[in-house]
Amino acid sequence: MAAVSPTTRCQESVTFEDVAVVFTDEEWSHLVPTQRDLYKEVMLENYNSIVSLGLPVPQPDVIFQLKRGDKPWMVDLHGSEEREWPESVSLDWETKPEIHDASNEKSEGSLRECLGRQSPLCPKFEVHTPDGRMGTEKQSSSGETHKKSLSQDKGLRRGSALPREILTKERHQECSDCGKTFFDHSSLTRHQRTHTGEKPYDCHECGKAFSHRSSLSRHLMSHTGESPYGCSVCAKAFFDRSSLTVHQRIHTGEKPFQCNECGKAFFDRSSLTRHQRIHTGESPYECHQCGKAFSQKSILTRHQLIHTGRKPYECNECGKAFYGVSSLNRHQKAHAGDPRYQCNECGKAFFDRSSLTQHQKIHTGDKPYECSECGKAFSQRCRLTRHQRVHTGEKPFECSVCGKVFSSKSSVIQHQRRYAKQGID
């Protein structure tokens, strides 16, 4: 079996939470300003080290707050027992000459005493040396205390490999819905919100809700207009560095995430994950109204509009409304002018390439979409979907007047014309 490179293993297992160090309010109060500056330096360096490995790491709350100069997020004491921490996180602080007066040494000693013991304030934290023994302070001839920094002991300087205990750390928290595993309970809890739809973080400006605090933090920037990360090529700005990194690959053409099944490559891991569901058939997003499942959350969102009847995308020219922005874009091309895409076989023209591609299957006889129940094949996926309702008995389209349900949208439109005709008569 081929050896797995350290980078590959990191991409499969490491999250920022695995190498992050957080404090309670009481622990934070023991830190003097220079120690807090060191904490900021180490946390930002660890985060940047993981990002530099090509991992699609969303910007955590603590990093967002540190960059803004805010007080970093602290551990919730009531939930601290559920948090699984790395077993060998070194909390030795790198000594800087300016912090070694008597008061600072006392403050640092209190912090080290807190972090070195097993207590509810700091569970599972121990001070370790590289060989695994409990760390001790060494005195030089001048009496100065020398210590190792967190980033040095963890081997997380920029460009260095991640330590072995992180690479081999076991995932023991499993999602009961999809089987995906995580290092800790908090990561599992965040993941499970994709199944439950829970969004506990509300924007106080517009009321929009989010499943993750970091997503809310990025959204809040849209109200303030703050976009601190600008592209040097096109000047487009982004709310976080990871989004800028993905965007810059458009200019460089880099596609580091490749599908093992078909070889297709993508700019980011999320696009690869969505693509791989084509091969696996996974459909994790289920409609609570009709039970239909989808491979992408955006497709589920568009589908749910069928049940509500809401069409949020309206044409400015004629007022016609659509369920999806892609449908609106295709429609607006009709107002823009002559169709650009012409069929070489019959001369029929279309406003977009996808419509031309679908049309050309009439000439080629290509029917790639086959029903698994009866084997009947179709040239378009939407026609296969309508056909499968014959087998499932699904009738997702409801008449808003009488409540009668139908298997296709065209049937409900035809049915409603009867009411319109009766109204005219």
From Swiss-Prot:
Superkingdom of source: Eukaryota
Annotated region described as Disordered, given as residue ranges: 125-160
Main localization, broad class: nucleus
Bias type Basic and acidic residues, positions: 125-136, 144-156
GO biological process: regulation of cytokine production; regulation of immune system process
Zinc finger (C2H2-type): 173-195, 201-223, 229-251, 257-279, 285-307, 313-335, 341-363, 369-391, 397-419
CDD domains: KRAB_A-box
Annotated compartments: Nucleus
Domain KRAB, residue spans: 14-85
One cellular component (GO) term of this entry: nucleoplasm
Family matches, as SMART domains: KRAB, ZnF_C2H2
GO molecular function, one term: DNA-binding transcription repressor activity, RNA polymerase II-specific
Pfam families linked to this entry: KRAB (PF01352), zf-C2H2 (PF00096)
Tagged with keyword Metal-binding: yes
Gene3D superfamilies assigned to the protein according to its UniProt record, in alphabetical order: 6.10.140.140, Classic Zinc Finger (3.30.160.60)
Function: May be involved in transcriptional regulation.
Family according to the record: Belongs to the krueppel C2H2-type zinc-finger protein family.
Protein name per Swiss-Prot or TrEMBL: Zinc finger protein 2
Source organism: Pongo abelii (Sumatran orangutan)
